[in-house]
Structures are given as C-alpha cells and as structure tokens.
Amino acid sequence: GESERFENVLTELFGLEPDAVGALRLVASTGSVIGMSRTYNSPDGKAAGTFGQGLPAIRSSEMISGTEPRRIIFLSEDSDSRANVGCVNGSSEDVQISLAMRNARGELLETRTMALGPYSNNQINRIFRDYQPVKGYVDVSAGSQSAFYYCYGSMLDNATSDPTTILPQVPSADTTFIPAAALAAGLAGAFFSTDVDLNNAGATSLTYRLLWLPRGVDNSNPVQSQQFSLAAGAG
C-alpha cells in the first residue's frame, strides 16, 4: 500500500512554531493504517546531523487499560544521562496516573501523580533529578478500571541530547529477543555499541543468560553468557 511521510509534522500540517510539544491522535476510515514517528534534535549548524528517537503509532489494543501496572525500565539520572516519562490519556474521561519511582534494587524512592484531562498528555522531565546518581525504573498505573492511557520513557545523553525511546513492558513466559546488538564501526567515524538493562518484574528471584546471535549465520548452537540472577522486584 501507499506510504506518506510528513517532515516536521507540527509545522507542515498544523503551522505551529516553537515551542510546541504534545501528542498526535491518528483517526482513519479503516483499521489498516500503521504509523511511526521520529522526534529529533537538530544541533546548531547541523554539523553533526540530527539525534532522535522513534515512537510507533500506538493502537487502541496496545493502550494501557484499567489498573494493571506497566513498567518502564532503563532509566538513569547522572552526569551522563537524564530520563523523562510521558503519558497520554486516550479517553474522554479524566485519569490519574501514579508513577512509582524505584532504584535498581527495587526500593521505592517516590510516587508521583500525573493528572490528565480528556485526550490530554504531559511529560515529567528529569524524573529522577532529586535522586541522582541513580539507575532505576518507573511503574505506571491508574486507580480506575475505566482508565485508558499510554506512557513511555525517554533516556537522553546529556552531551548531545540524543534520546532513546523506552516503551512500557509486562512480564511474559514467552521467549524474549533483543533484535539488534552491535559493537562495530559505522559511517563517518561512528562507532556503535549496545547497553542492555534487565529487570525482574515478578514475585520470585530468577536466573538468566544472554545468547549471542551473530548476524547472517546459523545460530542453532549460540554462544551463551555466564548465568546471572535478579532478586524479586530488582532491576
């Protein structure tokens, strides 16, 4: 099917000027439309190109419903990085969203509340500012069964403001893949490496390994890491 891309969509479609921030709602005649967005930083003079993060268009079936919590991991606040958490209300009713901030040991640091009106959205910048240096995560939840919303995290490099999108997760018994990892040179002097953050969202301790799957080869018998453990609620 046909695709269409809108560059700098807030200016192209809505004629907005700086400083405009918010969310977009996609309304279509059928359910067959899919979408993707990229929000990016353009450094002065663009000598270094752009730094940005992608966010997919979230379907109604992927929104967070009711009181079941979701976890946003891989958040940090220190001299190198900062973390933001944003939420959007997908319904015509007000919603109160609780954001329980925890450190990597699972200890509760603070619970903040985000109140959103119908179809409203907001973002808490540098959510762990008062607890730096810290690595942690945020559990988002609502107190009403009628709640219908979505939250995301964003980790930014303090030197470049290069952001990384972090989507909310729930534990699953399914096999889990991290579909890309790198330790390799790129174009124009770039060099890519991969950080991984793992979290135990269950009620019992667990052990795990990571398996290395090199690109373009048969990985039926992959190289395995040593075994690690995570206590219940830790990350």
Model-predicted segments: where are they?
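Gly/Pro-rich, tryptophan- and cysteine-flecked surface segments typical
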Residues: 1-235
